[in-house]
Amino acid sequence: IKPVLSALFKSEHFFDMLNRGCLIKTPADQVIGSLREMNVQFRPETEWDTNYGLWNTFYSWMVNMGQNPHDPPNVSGMPAYYQEPLFHEIWINSDSLPKRNQFTDIMINTGYARNGFRVQFNCVAFAQTLSNPGNPNDLIDESLGIFFRNDLSAQSKGQIKTQILLTGQQWDYYWTNAWAAYEANPTTANFNTVNTRLKALFQYFFNLSEFQLA
């Protein structure tokens, strides 16, 4: 089977752009995927009570969004995998979509704590993993490359940059200077300046419909 898989993984079909962003994420993809994309770290495996308590919280979010991995409704599994004609579109409805947005909103703003340990989307730490976070255009492009399967238009990215990272200003140095000031002197005030904008940026990204696509 190795030659078959090798040919498949190197084929044009495997990398076809039409195969990206064509399915709605499962709740598991939404929850676990966002934790991985935001580089959320848990305690060492020896601290099982803390970890399992937090993992149970995230598991409950999957259930509330419509997917209980340990208890499928019947022998056929989850309807989104077989129910015609909707299939994966079943994952999104008037109840589940607000919960998806609520989950990422909570993870950005407060997160969850157990035994004195908090897990949260650390937006500043995430930005520091990017190649050029001081450049607002590169920051947006590289972040979207991680969060989204399909890119946004140049016009949309420009509006997002101006309204959020530049706080309504027109010049990139409003963000560049703020980031440089934090990097040179990470005081609480400088941290809050960049963190507030990054939290608003990522929360906006996570609430876009494009984020729901796999």
Predicted feature locations:
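Flexible, low-complexity segments enriched for small/polar residues
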Residues: 5-214
